[in-house]
Amino acid sequence: MGGFEEAGSWVIVTMMWVGAFGGIMSKMKAFAPLSTLVMKLAKNVRQLMFMNGILCLAGNAALADEMAQIVTVGPITKELVENNVEGSEEDLYQLRLRNATFSSALGVFGSQLIPWHVYIGFYLGILSAVYPLHQFVAMDIIKYNVMAFIVVGSLLLLTLTGLDRFVPTFALPKEPKVKLKKKENLSENRSKKLA
């Protein structure tokens, strides 16, 4: 086999490995120190959500694959919100939607800004096959990907600054409606889970 014929032969096996990796790391609580660090840094819900976005982007860069980021970092951001934020079910749903948006959008569009990401490698391979007269590098693709810069930048900045309220149906619930659980409540919840 050669060329386009063998292009996807390894994808299913890789996705199974990535899914297993995310599940195993979650069961081992391997990322608990990372969650603890995020909670120490976050002073309010908006900062927590911004840090969830940064986690998604950092996970995408570290793992160099958007699906690996979704199955590995996705459960971390989900647990951060579920275990540390209190509010009405409707408001918590808004936070869950933002986490899903971070996982998806920062996975796909964030990958377009990471030079060592598998997407960029894939595109470079196609470009080199189609036009072999030029030696393409990752920055040839990244510097013209204005949409990725806008999506990643606006998602993070609108979340952090609160300017997301100007985008219809995109605003996060404000602080009195949702708030971080007090540290005493968190230690009680953890001791109940352990018992």
What are these regions (language model features)?
Residues 15-18, 38-80, 103-104:
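Hydrophobic alpha-helical transmembrane segments of multi-pass integral membrane proteins
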